[in-house]
């Protein structure tokens, strides 16, 4: 089974709203959607329910706080234990990324309307938390003047500390210090850093 996550915002096979949430997948070339409808719930759509578990597993790699899944008729498909959510101030969060893609900012503005809509993954570090994902959301919170976001605690490998060191060398200690760039510039700068970093560090 070949599962591909769709990372573009324009694809006629999918709902625009779900594309903006990054909840679209191709499974052996067939379209499947996972649409977030609450803090912990989502609807999964696609022709073959036999592959739903695999799609949900892929989806939850990025969004583990979503724990209940329903089909298009409202029947529960899968359920996981609910995760505890923290409320963190932006100043408590150390980014592990340097750049923010302005196209992604525009995309999330379609479905993030209040601070409570932002849920990220973090890793505890001394008195603070390292953000493992959700950097676009964090920067959007800064742009909107919001003080707090919500988070779930996850684990991470030691390489995250090396990326944090690189961020701090660039003066990035909180979300507001990341740099907003065009999509093309983001692809070049951030992807090049990641390629070089993981090649040198031997991380796969």
Language-model features: where?
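Short alpha-helix boundary/capping and kink motifs at helix termini
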Residues: 4-36, 40-48, 52-132, 136, ...
């Amino acid at each position: 089974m070949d599962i591909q996550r769709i990372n573009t915002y324009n694809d006629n096979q999918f709902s625009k709203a779900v594309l903006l949430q990054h909840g679209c997948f191709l499974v052996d070339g067939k379209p499947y959607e996972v649409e977030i409808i609450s803090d912990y719930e989502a609807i999964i759509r696609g022709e073959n329910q036999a592959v739903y578990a695999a799609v949900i597993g892929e989806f939850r790699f990025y969004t583990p706080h979503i724990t209940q899944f329903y089909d298009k008729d409202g029947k529960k498909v899968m359920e996981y234990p609910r995760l505890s959510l923290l409320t963190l101030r932006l100043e408590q969060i150390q980014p592990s990324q340097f750049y923010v893609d302005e196209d992604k900012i525009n995309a999330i503005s379609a479905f993030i309307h209040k601070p409570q809509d932002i849920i990220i993954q973090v890793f505890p570090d001394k008195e603070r938390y390292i953000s493992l994902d959700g950097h676009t959301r964090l920067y959007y919170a800064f742009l909107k003047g919001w003080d707090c976001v919500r988070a779930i605690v996850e684990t991470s490998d030691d390489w995250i500390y090396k990326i944090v060191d690189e961020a701090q060398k660039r003066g990035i200690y909180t979300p507001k210090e990341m740099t907003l760039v065009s999509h093309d510039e983001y692809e070049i700068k951030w992807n090049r850093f990641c390629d070089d970093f993981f090649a040198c560090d031997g991380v796969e």
